[in-house]
């Protein structure tokens, strides 16, 4: 074929692509569609979004376009919701219509499929309901909300305090030890075991989980999700989710070992055994979500999400204690008055410790570790704040805009525990406190996270006073965004009280 013949073909292809592009963006011209930056042909707004610092980028777009604005990521329509009113209207008022998740094509690399969607990214439907119900009931049966699980956490808190004491007041980074303690609680629930803090496989698993988290954001990831045909190019597909794949491989080894010790005649000791029991019941049912492929995804969901979010919040808590020693002293005084320095903290103590409870909540608000939540998708046309959002639109809930809303919080950009105290010093929780999101897809691990945060935090401050190491500069209170917002690396000294 000569060059002359290729020119008309190229023109035809270009016209076809432009027509397809116009079809995908035609809703922008619909009445009451949210405003937003003008998308480029083919790319949409991919070049307008800084995926390395998305929360800041969205804040700038909010100032320009308002609380409800639209984006076009290649051919994927996206609406970003900002502020308490818009977020609650979408997730609570229209809870049934916004409970779906958008397809995430790159998760096929990890083994996601119609029968293996896990819990967190599962489409809204029978499989999600089945797994959500199973996860909640199993965690409850394993002791969530009961004294038995509380004892697991307090035992692990004692191990964590012993590990802190081993540093003998010398400077160290606390993040690794916090990861290990929180992960052991999750490992006990999912796999019925705890690991020693120096176990090589445990260290490898935690390292892969942390590195995998960084793969949850970035320009290439967004491009591959927006244009999934590019996943057929091995050179591109091989560059994403490498650590998450390695994490699942490591988890597969643990699950294989665990299955060898499972006795179906005995009551389940952990979530994995409960899942295996459901698999036995579901044999012969091709529609069931209880299968080998989904087991690894469900356990990975609970393990990685349950570990990273809570340990990151605790890391923020210790950072804020060394930056605000006056707050630290008030927490310790309340611990001494209510618990003392010998007895282990209990969840029953929380009702008598309003200041400590306020501090923990303010750590969550200020740390703002999941600023953009997890994406939702509309399953039918809805209206939010007067704007019409069509069926099939991806929704991003800017939780950071709620947790740091200047119209709600007295000092939104400062650490201020009094946000959660009334004039009499009683604990109060404003409606805008949404670190676990809201609606039907709110975090199912919230009760466990609240227990761990209280017991680990109070145990550490009961035993240690924390400070900035002598001669070191004052650490930054600015976070680092990589889907989660983690504290900038810092060291502290833990001096026994």
From Swiss-Prot:
Changing residue 343 to G: In allele CYP2D6*25. Changing residue 296 to C: In allele CYP2D6*2, allele CYP2D6*12, allele CYP2D6*14, allele CYP2D6*17, allele CYP2D6*45A, allele CYP2D6*45B and allele CYP2D6*46; significantly reduced monooxygenase activity toward anandamide; slight decrease of monooxygenase activity towards bufuralol. Pfam families: p450. GO terms for cellular component: cytoplasm; endoplasmic reticulum; endoplasmic reticulum membrane; intracellular membrane-bounded organelle; mitochondrion. The keyword Mitochondrion does not apply. InterPro entries: Cyt_P450, Cyt_P450_CS, Cyt_P450_E_grp-I, Cyt_P450_E_grp-I_CYP2D-like, Cyt_P450_sf, Cytochrome_P450_fam2. Changing residue 337 to G: In allele CYP2D6*94. It catalyses: (5Z,8Z,11Z,14Z)-eicosatetraenoate + reduced [NADPH--hemoprotein reductase] + O2 = (8R,9S)-epoxy-(5Z,11Z,14Z)-eicosatrienoate + oxidized [NADPH--hemoprotein reductase] + H2O + H(+); (5Z,8Z,11Z,14Z)-eicosatetraenoate + reduced [NADPH--hemoprotein reductase] + O2 = (11R,12S)-epoxy-(5Z,8Z,14Z)-eicosatrienoate + oxidized [NADPH--hemoprotein reductase] + H2O + H(+); (5Z,8Z,11Z,14Z)-eicosatetraenoate + reduced [NADPH--hemoprotein reductase] + O2 = (14S,15R)-epoxy-(5Z,8Z,11Z)-eicosatrienoate + oxidized [NADPH--hemoprotein reductase] + H2O + H(+); N-(5Z,8Z,11Z,14Z-eicosatetraenoyl)-ethanolamine + reduced [NADPH--hemoprotein reductase] + O2 = N-(8,9-epoxy-5Z,11Z,14Z-eicosatrienoyl)-ethanolamine + oxidized [NADPH--hemoprotein reductase] + H2O + H(+). Changing residue 486 to T: In allele CYP2D6*2, allele CYP2D6*10, allele CYP2D6*12, allele CYP2D6*14, allele CYP2D6*17, allele CYP2D6*45A, allele CYP2D6*45B and allele CYP2D6*46; impaired metabolism of sparteine. Belongs to the cytochrome P450 family. This is Cytochrome P450 2D6. The lineage of its organism: Eukaryota, Metazoa, Chordata, Craniata, Vertebrata. The gene is CYP2D6.
């Amino acid at each position: 074929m000569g060059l002359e013949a290729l020119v008309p073909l190229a023109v035809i292809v270009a016209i076809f692509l432009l027509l397809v592009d116009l079809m995908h963006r035609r809703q922008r011209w619909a009445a009451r569609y949210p405003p937003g930056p003008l998308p480029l042909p083919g790319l949409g707004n991919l070049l307008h979004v800084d995926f390395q610092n998305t929360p800041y980028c969205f804040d700038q777009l909010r100032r320009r376009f308002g609380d409800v604005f639209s984006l076009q990521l290649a051919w994927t329509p996206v609406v970003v919701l900002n502020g308490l009113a818009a977020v609650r209207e979408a997730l609570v008022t229209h809870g049934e219509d916004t409970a779906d998740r958008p397809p995430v094509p790159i998760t096929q690399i990890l083994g996601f499929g119609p029968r293996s969607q896990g819990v967190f990214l599962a489409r809204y439907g029978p499989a999600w309901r089945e797994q959500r119900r199973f996860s909640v009931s199993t965690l409850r049966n394993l002791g969530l909300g009961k004294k038995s699980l509380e004892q697991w956490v307090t035992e692990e808190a004692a191990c964590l305090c012993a590990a802190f004491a081993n540093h003998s007041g010398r400077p160290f980074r606390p993040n690794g030890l916090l990861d290990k303690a929180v992960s052991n609680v999750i490992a006990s629930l999912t796999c019925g075991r705890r690991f020693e803090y120096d176990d090589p496989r445990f260290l490898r698993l935690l390292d892969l989980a942390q590195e995998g988290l960084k793969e949850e954001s970035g320009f290439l990831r967004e491009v591959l999700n927006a244009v999934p045909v590019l996943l057929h190019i091995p050179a591109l597909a091989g560059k994403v989710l490498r650590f998450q794949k390695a994490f699942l491989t490591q988890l597969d080894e643990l699950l294989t070992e665990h299955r060898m010790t499972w006795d179906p005649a005995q009551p389940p000791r952990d979530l994995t055994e409960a899942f295996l029991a459901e698999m036995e019941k579901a044999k012969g049912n091709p529609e069931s979500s209880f299968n080998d492929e989904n087991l690894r995804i469900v356990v990975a969901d609970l393990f990685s999400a349950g570990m990273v979010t809570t340990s990151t919040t605790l890391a923020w808590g210790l950072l804020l204690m060394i930056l605000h020693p006056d707050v630290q002293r008030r927490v310790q005084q309340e611990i001494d008055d209510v618990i003392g320095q010998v007895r282990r903290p209990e969840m029953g103590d929380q009702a008598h410790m309003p200041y400590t409870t306020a501090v923990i909540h303010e750590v969550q608000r200020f740390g703002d570790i999941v600023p953009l939540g997890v994406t939702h998708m509309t399953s039918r046309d809805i209206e939010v704040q007067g704007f019409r959002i069509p069926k099939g639109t991806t929704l991003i809930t800017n939780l950071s805009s709620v947790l740091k809303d200047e119209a709600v919080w007295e000092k939104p950009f400062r650490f201020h525990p009094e946000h959660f105290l009334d004039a009499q010093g009683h604990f109060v929780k404003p409606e805008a406190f949404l670190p676990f999101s809201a609606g039907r897809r709110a975090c199912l691990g919230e009760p466990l996270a609240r227990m761990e945060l209280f017991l680990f935090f109070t145990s550490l401050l009961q035993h240690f006073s924390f400070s900035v190491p002598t001669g070191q500069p004052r650490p930054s209170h600015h976070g680092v965004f990589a889907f989660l917002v983690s504290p900038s690396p810092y060291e502290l000294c833990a001096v026994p009280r």
